[in-house]
């Protein structure tokens, strides 16, 4: 087992978690805003 490779993989995995969480959060915000606009359109009609 190559420990340097394993340590690099673990460091990359740990550092990629916040990035993926932030991107998922922004996607969720965009979708919820879109859904709210659709609901408002139906609410007026």
Swiss-Prot record:
Record GO cellular component, one term: host cell mitochondrial outer membrane
UniProt KW Transcription regulation keyword: no
Keywords recorded for this protein, A-Z: Host cell junction, Host Golgi apparatus, Host membrane, Host mitochondrion, Host mitochondrion outer membrane, Membrane, Transmembrane, Transmembrane helix
Keyword Transcription regulation: no
Compartment annotation: Host cell junction, Host plasmodesma; Host Golgi apparatus; Host chloroplast envelope; Host mitochondrion outer membrane
Listed transmembrane segments: 9-29
Main location: host cell
Functional description taken from the UniProt entry: Together with movement protein P17, plays an essential role in virus long distance movement.
Family named by the database record: Belongs to the polerovirus movement protein P3a family.
Protein name: P3a
Gene (name only): ORF3a
